[in-house]
Amino acid sequence: MLLSKRAEMFLPDQWPAYFSKTKGCKVWDLDGNEYTDMSIMGIGTNTLGYNHEEVDAAVMKTVAAGNMSTFNCPEEVYLAEKLIEIHPWADMARFARSGGEANAIAIRIARAASGKDKVAICGYHGWHDWYLAANLGDDNHLAGHLLSGLDPKGVPQNLRGTVYPFNYNNYAELEEIVNNNDIGVIKMEVMRNKGPEDNFLHRVRDLATKRGIVLIFDECTSGFRQTFGGIHKMYGVEPDMAMFGKALGNGYGITATIGRREIMESAQSTFISSTFWTERIGPTAALKTLEVMEREKSWERITETGTDIMARWQTLAHKHGLKINVAGLPSIASFGVDSPNALAYKTLITQEMLGKGYLSSNLIFSSLAHTPDVVDGYFNALDPIFGLIKECEQGRDVMALLKGPICHAGFKRLN
């Protein structure tokens, strides 16, 4: 089971881990119980809402016409043209069906273009060997990017010393890595818990340009959430390559790697291929998703929703005399209670909200389906639970309120 969807990440032994159907921001489990999803919304894949009628209709039309052929589907050409229209700095595109694949494609091409093996990274970039090699020799190198104590068993030992993590907004650390190693690629998420400081992204761009390093922005999570396209557009910094996923197909598998011609053409000197990257459903879903996004200005609406949620968390905390830390993109908002019992409180929220018909923890991926009425209902349900947490801060035993174990800690990236 996918790590992010395991019951242990939410409510061990009690979380209804499997679904029967979805619609909007509603999820039904296998027993027919209905829940309002105020959590990860398919791990951020459904910004338009689950089971979106227009996207699903386009997909069903493709299913009826045929999904696979000896020929290529024209939709991948149309999608490439659209992504390049949205990102004029790019000239070419390649498609896959998962974020990990898109990251692996980008690294293969960038290494081919630079002629160098070593990569500096900041953020979460999938599960492939090239990335997990960062933990060879020190299983905490990815602690601030993926998970603490991750043992990279199965990753060839000879990849040790090929990947160097650096911390977001720490330009001096990156510069030292570049000065002391033959770095050919810098790969990073554009924004993490907070935005760039002290012209960080511009300085990274300048460093990459001066040293002949390929700069890659991983927008698999951040793309199409605060801008129509990559969030790098907000900061006026253009990479050499970028990847998009999650929101791109509104729940259907499609990811994209775009880049400058002089970089992307290096793919011709190596081998990158997969049969099912040529299926038709993914690009069809992406084209319709982008059409709906552009018409509805979805990035503005989900940002507005997320901003409202973040403010109301703070208001609710103030009402109950709690101190919380709010972080993330507005449309990927998260909070944590400033307490040694923070993880227990997160578990308590999930437990109590589940009983009220909500899938909830301390992280919300906003979607168009999260209307004001839905958000109001969520906060009405959450209010007394914050009261319970305050009681625990004053001495009540939170463990006595829990019906099972405390949830596990999760990813440390944009959330």
Report residues per predicted region.
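Conserved PLP-binding catalytic core of the aspartate aminotransferase-like
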Residues: Y18-F19, T307-A311, A317-T350, S366, ...
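Glycine-rich loop-to-alpha-helix module at the N-terminal edge of alpha/beta enzyme cores
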Residues: E34-K116
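Active-site core of PLP-dependent enzymes with the aminotransferase class I/II
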Residues: N170-A172, E176, M188-V214
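Structural signature of PLP-dependent enzymes
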Residues: T289-Q314
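PLP-dependent enzyme catalytic core of the Aspartate aminotransferase-like
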Residues: E294-E296, E304, G355-N415
